[in-house]
């Protein structure tokens, strides 16, 4: 249906990225080509309205995407992409498929993490209405515009309390479309997530950031630790492999940055039947301290201790976004600490 938007061009190398070529981000204010916001001082404005309830919303999005692609083929980098770490020069296949998707049209959350940007205006963000996107996603699916192996990530707010969450997940599962990656507080149990896990096409990530009630309540500012642990155990029981349910620990200096706190967390993961742990660094702390090699070294030393403790229990450590950035930017320190 949309093939006319993707006329074949000579397969020369040019600078672009997976998101620009084949990505879509359903954000809180519109549809974007990508979900990166840290690479440019230019605000990423939507290319189409999420309120449209007809195929022209999708048509307009692909028209805009093709314009950006043609611009990059001519060697003109979009100003909003300058400095982005995802850019690379290669031959990009002309195809009318979405291979990366981010879904985060909501800002509501059932926790109030001390590090989250929404915590400063909780009433405002929790009272914002969800932007409906189910109709648009159905249009994508019906027109075969989503690759079967598309990476579909749910983020922003708490996905499980989105009005359309269950229907959206069931849409993907019923049509055998995409590999889902759902980031959640773990407070609410979802039958749709259960179905997605059972299908083998979903990774479910919960970020308790703690291994006991007191620390959990301090970080999340809600008393729900026992409920979260109970839900994690239920999800872990049905995961097809040991990698589908994952726990995340965001290191928050002066709050949970001790080996004792991490050990408690790792022990809880083991008790729940979880064998993959994502380790990350609190974003705003890292932005402020990224040039302080002494502080960064301490983070790496803590990660090394945690890694050994996990390995003894059959758990695999997976670096997450900010930790990855830190280990790349401070590769010499990281290698020195982790390899010795």
Stretches with model-predicted labels:
Residues 1-126, 295-340:
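N-terminal pre-core extensions flanking Radical SAM catalytic domains
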Residues 142-146:
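Glycine-rich helix-loop-beta junction characteristic of Rossmann-like nucleotide cofactor-binding loops
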Residues 133-140, 165-167:
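Leucine-rich repeat
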Residues 164-170, 190-198, 257-262:
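Distinct, well-ordered alpha-helical segments
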Residues 98-108, 117-134, 147-162, 173-189, ...:
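Core AdoMet radical
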Residues 149-153, 178-181, 202-208, 226-330, ...:
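Conserved C-terminal portion of the radical SAM core fold
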Residues 161-166, 292-293:
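Active-site core of PLP-dependent enzymes with the aminotransferase class I/II
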């Amino acid at each position: 249906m949309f093939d006319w938007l993707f006329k074949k061009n000579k397969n020369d190398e040019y600078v672009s990225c997976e998101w620009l070529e084949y990505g879509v981000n359903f954000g809180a204010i519109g549809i974007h080509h990508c979900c990166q916001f840290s690479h440019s001082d230019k605000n990423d404005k939507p290319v189409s309205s999420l309120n449209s309830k007809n195929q022209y919303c999708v048509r307009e999005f692909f028209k805009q995407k093709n314009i950006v692609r043609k611009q990059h083929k001519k060697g003109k980098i979009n100003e909003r992409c300058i400095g982005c770490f995802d850019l690379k020069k290669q031959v990009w296949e002309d195809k009318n498929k979405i291979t990366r998707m981010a879904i985060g049209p909501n800002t509501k959350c059932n926790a109030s993490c001390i590090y989250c940007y929404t915590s400063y205006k909780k009433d405002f963000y929790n009272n914002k209405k969800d932007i409906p996107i189910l109709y648009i996603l159905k249009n994508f699916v019906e027109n075969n515009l989503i690759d079967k192996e598309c990476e579909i990530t749910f983020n922003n707010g708490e996905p499980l309390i989105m009005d359309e969450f269950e229907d959206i997940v069931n849409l993907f599962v019923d049509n055998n479309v995409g590999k889902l990656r759902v980031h959640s507080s773990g407070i609410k149990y979802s039958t749709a997530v259960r179905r997605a896990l059972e299908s083998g096409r979903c990774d479910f990530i919960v970020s308790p950031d703690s291994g006991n009630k007191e620390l959990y309540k301090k970080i999340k500012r809600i008393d729900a630790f026992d409920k979260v642990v109970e839900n994690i155990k239920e999800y872990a029981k049905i995961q097809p492999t040991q990698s589908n349910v994952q726990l995340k620990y965001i290191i928050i200096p002066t709050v949970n940055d001790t080996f004792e706190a991490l050990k408690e967390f790792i022990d809880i993961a083991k008790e729940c039947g979880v064998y993959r742990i994502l380790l990350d660094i609190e974003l705003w702390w890292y932005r402020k301290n990224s040039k302080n090699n002494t502080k960064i070294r301490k983070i790496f030393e803590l990660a090394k201790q945690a890694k050994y403790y996990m390995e003894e229990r059959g758990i695999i450590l997976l670096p997450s976004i900010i930790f990855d950035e830190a280990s790349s930017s401070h590769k010499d320190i990281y290698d020195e600490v982790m390899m010795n």
